[in-house]
Amino acid sequence: MNPKTGYVTLCYHYIRPDNDDPFPRILGTKKSEFENQIRMLKENFNIISFSDALSFSKDKNALDQNKSNVLITFDDGLSDHFLAAKILQKYKIKSIFFIPTCVLQDQLPANPIIIHYGIALFGLECFLTVLRDALKENDLEIEKYDIEYIPEKDNVWEKIDETKSIFKYKLDYNNSRKILLYIYQNLIHKDDPNILKKMHIVKPQVKEMIEMGHTIGAHTHTHISVAATELSKKDFLKEMIFPKKYFEE
């Protein structure tokens, strides 16, 4: 990258333990790999903060012109991010963490995180079984949304992608959330009542991250796919306007 053109953004999601991961099927960057990457970036690039990026949007000469600039961001308000924030603090790096407000206000997980943990903990077959129960409970046609999965025959990753597409493209906004919360409450939370803090960050950690100098950003309310979701005015305000006000207050 030509350093005079601006900056590159690196977006992280899961940062997982090196050993004894309680959720080994959650895919992500290992803690040691993450720290090695941060060390390498620190040595070879100019790592900017979110405020630096905002300054650049107003003044194109606001960034270092001698090195390539990198902004590090994190999506989804995951529990892993508190560890990441402490590693960044060790290297005097400030980042921005985008958090769905349902995690903090409602104390409920974001939509895709329910899918990740549900499949990682119980397998795709079990997840699809509870999905059918949820569809039936909400008077929705099982045949319209059902996915047939034969472990000995089908590619599991392709079937997982199909499963994700149900919630992203086929179910409407309200039904998608209702079905996912049914799966969370009747499968994931039922198995472990303390699972939410293992999935997502909590308010005291967010406060401490702000004290470290990190920035918190909105990531809609329930982590919807904005481009793929038709929203009423009320739902638009909830997903798009409320999160910004929540963090500002």
Q: Where in the sequence are the language-model features?
A:
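Acidic/histidine-rich helix-loop elements
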Residues: R16-T29, A228
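Membrane-proximal basic amphipathic "stem/tether" segments
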Residues: M1-V8
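Generic enzyme active-site microenvironment
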Residues: T73-F74, G217
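Short, glycine/acidic-enriched loop or turn micro-motifs at the edges of active sites
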Residues: L78-S79, T222
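Membrane-embedded segments
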Residues: T73, S79-I87
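Metal-dependent polysaccharide deacetylase catalytic core of the NodB/CE4 family, i.e.
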Residues: L10, I15-R16, K67, Y91-E249
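C-terminal domain-boundary segment and adjacent tail
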Residues: I26-D64, K92, I201, K207-E211, ...
